[in-house]
Amino acid sequence: MSEAPQARRVGSVDDHSVYDDAKTYYTSEERHNNSRSGPRQRTYSQNSLLGQMERLGLKEPFRRGSHDESNHNRRFLIQVDPTLESLKSQEDTDGNMQITIEDNGPKVLTLRTAGSNGHNRFDIRGTYMLSNLLQELTLAQEYGRKQVILDEARLNENPVNRLSRLIRDHFWDALTRRIDASSIEVAAKDPKDWTDDPRPRIYVPKGAPEQLEYYKKLAADKPDIRLDVVELPETITPEYVVGINKAPGLLAVDMEETVDPKTGERVMSGRPFVVPGGRFNELYGWDSYMESLGLLVNDKVYLAKSMVLNFCFCIKHYGKILNATRSYYLCRSQPPFLTDMALRVYDKIRHEPDATEFLRTAILAAIKEYHSVWVAEPRLDPVTGLSRYRPEGTGVPPETEADHFLHILEPYYKKHNMTFKEFVEAYNFGRIREPELDKYFLHDRAVRESGHDTSYRLEGVCADLATVDLNTLLFKYETDIARTIRNVFGDKLVIPAEYCVGSLQPGQVETSAIWDRRSKRRKLAIDKYLWNEEAGMYFDYDTAKRQQCNYESCTTFWALWAGVASPKQAAIMVTRALPKFEAYGGLLSGTEESRGQIGLDRPNRQWDYPYGWAPQQMLAWTGLYRYSFTEEAERLAYKWLFMITKAFSDFNGVVVEKYDVTRPVDPHRVDAEYGNQGLGFKGVAKEGFGWVNASYIYGLQIINAHMRRALGTLTPYDTFIKALEDNRNRALSEMV
């Protein structure tokens, strides 16, 4: 893998960097004072005169401002508000506060150069530069600037460098939350709260008295935010969770003691975490692992470490890594990635004094989660020894839009002569029994726990499936735990009482041999029930029907990531399976044949063809690298990165949750049940989407330096590879 790219730092006025973050760039008075170019008043009067002439429909005599043909360190002297209005009225022809390839403006705007004190002019041309100008001026306006001196380098910046920089300097910060006094109003906001009074609320587990005291004091100190603080009972049942659905709230996560820089006093501070973005404003399970891959590349190690510790807190107090940290997710988990996440953080901090203790805590938490959640009833299938997504729970999932299940529930509420709301209330609290509906929601909850909500692969069967994804992840848990106990803890890990579940006893010693045996048993079961030699891929296994499924899913490549495939199986997968999933923009979630026909009665599902998701890409790249399929990993990474970069360049800096990897022009447009997160910004995108941000940063480590240069010039993969072949053939012919 190539080294992490560094943004080029170019000296500008007063030695500030051209590529400073927006806050630094736009709050510097010194940077935006045109003292080097002459008196400021003269510039204002000239621009004022020009504005009057333009409003009167008069043209300025050419002699007053010749075009600037120089191209070294060019900077523009811009009056923010009038220029922004001119830009929008001229170039944003569809009025959506974005400048894209779909707008029909002239695609050119003339700006005054700062070096000439506004006398000379220069044309800003093309969608990319104009949309960057819109973004920069939107930010300048938000920071209260009336006039700016804007570096041209921020407008024509290499798109790979620009997006990488925005992710590193802006998007991660915009997505970071702490559940404490500094930002609880932001962290508590829940776009999925459909109740009549969506006030901020936090649920604190029974065994966290310091947190309970902290939040009660916070509520008393800030009565205006109306924070409701609730202590959870010792035992949390599905019935209890249904009972609090009308009062949804955040779940407390870990806190740490820090020193207040102003007072020097020790205070409680929430451990930070990254949220996915859009309507997902809480700590999510597998999203966090994917995000950590990018955070670690960007040297945000403390943030990734904090997320691991937050997960350890969740396992200790809630019994599992939750789907997400909201009260309505208390019975539901998500795909388990804790061991790999913790080991990646440990590799970055192993020189720190508390590194070994950090890893010990994470591995102990993973062992507890493994035994209490994944290899216990109801998720364990005792016949195969494999595990399923099969969460507890009752009633209708409350986080969905109010009418999401309308078509499912309509026959039932009509049957009982009730309104939709009346029926949901009666069904949720067990006043009405409908076994078929119970079965439907059992599978629906399982789909949501899988993280693949929704897909025809899982619909109506998920709770019965021993899926490829879950069981390869558990194999990875088993091998990670074995290796860590052997290599870090001297082949002996003592289990403290707080981590004991099931048959585990306080003081019990875990050795690598125990976990090696578990992984070998799981591999045998995976090969027996999930591997299909003829198809050259892994399939889910239906534990109710006792047969292998035939839906072709991209999760087959998780076996490479986890290392459960033999070298022979890996080679067969690359030959037979990979061509079925590879598309213009990377890997498809599933094949078109497996998805089946789509129509009014059978709409698209977002985890099916033709959509591609960041987790599937990253796990496949890593898995292919693991088995030395470097060329394939680089090719897939390039396609994904090119698609993201092209959409970013053509559509005003857009970065979204998922993509249609079959659409070359507008892959961010998704026609599925939940739409797409990351689209609804005005002027400038400020957060992207968590795991797509990570996939971009991580993917740049996968491709080689030559590919990175081609990516910066927006060269499609086929064009890039043809140019390489032509150059190679030319070189060979010259040698003859």
UniProtKB/Swiss-Prot annotation:
It catalyses: alpha,alpha-trehalose + H2O = alpha-D-glucose + beta-D-glucose. Coiled coil: none annotated. One of its GO terms (biological process) is trehalose catabolic process. Ca(2+) binds at D92, D94, N96, Q98, D103. Residues 35-47 have a biased composition (Polar residues). The keyword Heme does not apply. Pfam families: Trehalase, Trehalase_Ca-bi. Substrate binds at R279, W286, D287, N323, R332, S333, Q334, E399, R448, G451. It is an enzyme of class 3 (hydrolase). GO terms for cellular component: alpha,alpha-trehalose-phosphate synthase complex (UDP-forming). Hydrolyzes intracellular trehalose to glucose. Plays a role in pathogenicity, specifically in proliferation of invasive hyphae in rice blast disease. Belongs to the glycosyl hydrolase 37 family. PANTHER family: CYTOSOLIC NEUTRAL TREHALASE-RELATED, TREHALASE. This is Cytosolic neutral trehalase. It comes from Pyricularia oryzae (strain 70-15 / ATCC MYA-4617 / FGSC 8958) (Rice blast fungus).
